[in-house]
């Protein structure tokens, strides 16, 4: 690629210290290989093993750090301080996007439909949660991605164990109303929605969990997604509003449900989605003609905005 030199020296930020380190290493290696194939002068940079001050030796950064430390505004803040352009969402949008409760609060304040929820503390009366949300519910750590620490609870007696599992990953835990229906994911490139993908985990999987996302090969990905053209455009428009409401930029992903009455519900936003062979953004981009290598270069192109 003749114009790859315009990027200068690129740090591909991968690994890190979060619960999603293994996924980030896989994603980061895939991105690194793609950039190198495209002629970009790119190098792997793992903040767990190197001081972030060494980033001053690079012209820009491609962030493929998933979870805390990489997706929550921390590394974005460091890069802002060092005046190094980087891919994706900025400090504030990243911090909001990593916090499932803050995300929901912003969506609710913007009149965007998101599943009802309750924050769970040691003092919370679980019977009142069940009375409010019904069963089943899904228990989630508020600040984790990749479905880490999540459980579906169908019986009241399983509530405590699910909360215990979630608190191993985060001090803040939430219960969210379970929405029965079809799950969709909407990817973004250059701030615009790509074709919707329908997710169909196998029957023995309660939801699109960590194993389904990264380890199983029997998850079905529907492109086209099975929605009518009108419905797909409606969902894309809804998710674009949701993406912009939290301050997300560039590339990312929003997960949503359609209930049995046909209503759409926003679940969460992902500001640094996976880029592995199982990942959803590459699948959506492929549907509109992007190879994986072209996708990675297009994401990196965002770092040139305002510098030309």
From Swiss-Prot:
Keywords for the protein's UniProt record, in alphabetical order: ATP-binding, Cell shape, Cell wall biogenesis/degradation, Cytoplasm, Ligase, Magnesium, Manganese, Metal-binding, Nucleotide-binding, Peptidoglycan synthesis
Annotated Gene Ontology cellular component terms: cytosol
First-listed, main subcellular location of the protein, grouped into a coarse class: cytoplasm
InterPro entries in the cross-refs: ATP-grasp (IPR011761), D-Ala_lig_Van_CS (IPR000291), D_ala_D_ala (IPR005905), Dala_Dala_lig_C (IPR011095), Dala_Dala_lig_N (IPR011127), PreATP-grasp_dom_sf (IPR016185)
Database matches in SUPFAM superfamilies: Glutathione synthetase ATP-binding domain-like, PreATP-grasp domain
UniProt binding sites for Mg(2+) 1: 255, 268
Pathway: Cell wall biogenesis; peptidoglycan biosynthesis
PROSITE patterns per the UniProt record, alphabetical: ATP_GRASP (PS50975), DALA_DALA_LIGASE_1 (PS00843), DALA_DALA_LIGASE_2 (PS00844)
BP-aspect Gene Ontology terms: cell wall organization; peptidoglycan biosynthetic process; regulation of cell shape
Residues involved in ATP binding: 130-185
Subcellular location: Cytoplasm
Binding note for cofactor: Binds 2 magnesium or manganese ions per subunit.
Residues where Mg(2+) 2 binds: 268, 270
Domain ATP-grasp: 104-301
Cofactor(s) required for function per UniProt: Mg(2+); Mn(2+)
Function according to Swiss-Prot or TrEMBL: Cell wall formation.
Name this protein carries in UniProt: D-alanine--D-alanine ligase
């Amino acid at each position: 690629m003749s114009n790859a030199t315009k990027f200068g020296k690129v740090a591909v930020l991968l690994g890190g210290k979060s619960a999603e380190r293994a996924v980030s290493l896989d994603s980061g290696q895939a991105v690194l290989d793609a950039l190198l194939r495209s002629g970009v002068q790119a190098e792997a940079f793992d903040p767990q093993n190197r001081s972030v001050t060494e980033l001053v030796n690079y012209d820009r950064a491609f962030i493929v750090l998933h979870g805390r430390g990489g997706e929550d505004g921390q590394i974005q803040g460091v890069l802002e301080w060092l005046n190094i352009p980087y891919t994706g969402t900025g400090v504030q949008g990243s911090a909001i996007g990593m916090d499932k409760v803050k995300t929901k609060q912003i969506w609710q304040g913007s009149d965007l439909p998101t599943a009802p929820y309750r924050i769970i503390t040691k003092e919370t009366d679980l019977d009142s949660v069940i009375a409010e949300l019904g069963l089943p519910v899904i228990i989630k750590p508020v600040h984790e991605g990749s479905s880490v620490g999540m459980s579906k609870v169908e019986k009241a007696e399983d509530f405590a164990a699910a909360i215990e599992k979630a608190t191993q990953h985060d001090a803040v835990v939430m219960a969210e109303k379970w929405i029965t229906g079809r799950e969709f994911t909407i990817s973004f490139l250059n701030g615009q929605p790509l074709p919707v993908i329908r997710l169909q985990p196998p029957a023995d999987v309660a939801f699109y969990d960590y194993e389904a996302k990264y380890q199983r090969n029997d998850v079905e990905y529907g492109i086209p997604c099975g929605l009518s053209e009108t419905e797909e455009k409606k969902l894309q428009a809804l998710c674009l509003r949701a993406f912009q409401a939290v301050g997300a930029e560039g590339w990312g992903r929003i997960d949503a449900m359609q209930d049995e009455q046909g209503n759409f519900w926003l679940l969460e936003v992902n500001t640094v989605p996976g880029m592995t062979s199982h990942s959803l953004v590459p699948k959506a981009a492929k549907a509109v003609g992007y190879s994986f290598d072209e996708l990675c270069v297009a994401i990196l192109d965002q770092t040139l905005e305002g510098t030309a």
